[in-house]
């Protein structure tokens, strides 16, 4: 198949999943065309089956804001026409689903029918999409998609509750490359960070309010009272500066390391003892799954799709949003009991096998064929 993938090319979950999906499909022989405004962060290899098409937005004095949606639609049309795309797979509803609808209508003028599959990832539905300024467009563009997938049952249910959606939503969970995210012996790396054999806690995110970064630090502060530990904060975003300020106020600057955005996050997971993710909302929790695959138990909130990844009392613990005391208590129950920690670690790595790319990517291929078959029938009627 010739597949056009539209996504945000950033460190966020939707961009990571879209890019990894494209890479996996290319490895299986499909022609993958990424259509984005920048080269995706995870697009770090050369393949004869992967093509990148940059969306260039014109800048004119008349425009207060550059017309990205129009430029994206035009690029999608151009790629579909001259590379004979079989379908578009757009990730994140805003604005990609509505732009894809526009591109599809334009392509009909060229007697081309290119189906659109929209994958919902989270805040496009749970946060941004519920804004009254976006709701009609989100609802319309989802209903006009030829196929719709969601990364979790929670997100699928939330979409039906928030919008008048007539389409069936196929739940296909996120996946990981287990050859990359796996247990590794990085003891030399750990000794460089934890010179006094401290326990290492990890948090990775885009540092936005929904991630509740202060809860990460407050939980760590409580843990630090009973256990010698350090916290590795991986990522960047608007909440990083306030987080650094909070660290200073709590006198934790020597124990918390802000590492910024990192590509080789698996190297960091390899030295971790616990992963903290106290988010107010998560559609799935890809970073939690990555940690589990590396044998790192997860301490999380019970928000959204996290409960589909973190099995409370087996590979980690879940708590109500904001309950930092329980998160700290659960953390200490593992950090102070090596036998129990090892049981959780073993279960974490085993559970992650259910989300391997070898199991999940074929589900997308099957869904593509289903939508293409239905589109062909519709076209010929």
Task: Label the predicted regions.
Residues 154, 175:
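Carbohydrate-associated surface elements
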Residues 297-300, 310:
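Short hydrophobic beta-strand element within catalytic cores of glycosyltransferases
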Residues 312-313, 317-324, 333-338:
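Conserved acidic donor-binding segment of nucleotide-sugar-dependent glycosyltransferases
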Residues 194-211, 217-220:
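Conserved donor-binding/catalytic core segment of Leloir-type glycosyltransferases
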């Amino acid at each position: 198949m010739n597949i056009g993938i539209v996504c945000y090319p950033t460190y966020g979950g939707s961009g990571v999943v879209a890019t990894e999906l494209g890479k996996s499909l290319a490895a299986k022989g499909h022609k993958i065309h990424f259509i984005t405004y920048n080269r995706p962060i995870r697009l770090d290899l050369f393949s004869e089956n992967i093509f990148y098409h940059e969306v260039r937005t014109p800048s004119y004095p008349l425009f207060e804001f550059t017309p990205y949606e129009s430029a994206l639609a035009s690029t999608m049309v151009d790629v579909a026409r001259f590379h004979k795309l079989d379908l578009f797979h757009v990730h994140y509803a805003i604005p990609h689903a509505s732009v894809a609808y526009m591109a599809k209508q334009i392509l009909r003028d060229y007697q081309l029918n290119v189906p659109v599959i929209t994958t919902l990832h989270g805040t496009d539905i749970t946060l941004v999409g519920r804004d009254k300024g976006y709701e009609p467009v989100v609802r319309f563009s989802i209903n006009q998609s030829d196929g719709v997938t969601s990364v979790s049952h929670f997100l699928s249910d939330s979409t039906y509750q928030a919008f008048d959606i007539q389409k069936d939503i196929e739940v296909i969970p996120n996946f990981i490359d287990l050859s990359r995210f796996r247990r590794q012996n990085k003891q030399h790396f750990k000794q460089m960070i934890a010179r006094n054999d401290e326990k290492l806690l990890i948090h990775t995110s885009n540092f936005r309010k929904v991630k509740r970064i202060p809860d990460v630090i407050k939980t760590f502060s409580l843990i630090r009272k009973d256990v010698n530990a350090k916290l590795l904060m991986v990522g960047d975003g608007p909440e990083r500066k306030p987080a650094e300020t909070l660290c200073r106020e709590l006198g934790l600057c020597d124990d918390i390391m802000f590492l910024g955005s990192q590509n080789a996050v698996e190297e960091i997971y390899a030295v971790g003892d616990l992963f903290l993710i106290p988010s107010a909302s998560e559609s799935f929790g890809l970073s939690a799954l990555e940690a589990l695959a590396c044998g790192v138990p997860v301490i999380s909130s019970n928000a959204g799709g996290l409960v589909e990844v973190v099995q409370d009392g087996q590979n980690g613990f879940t708590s109500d949003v904001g309950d930092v005391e329980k998160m700290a208590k659960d953390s200490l129950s593992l950090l102070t009991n090596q036998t129990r920690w090892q049981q959780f670690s073993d279960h974490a790595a085993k559970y992650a096998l259910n989300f391997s790319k070898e199991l999940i990517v074929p589900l997308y291929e099957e869904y593509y064929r289903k939508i293409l078959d239905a589109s062909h029938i519709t076209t010929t009627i």
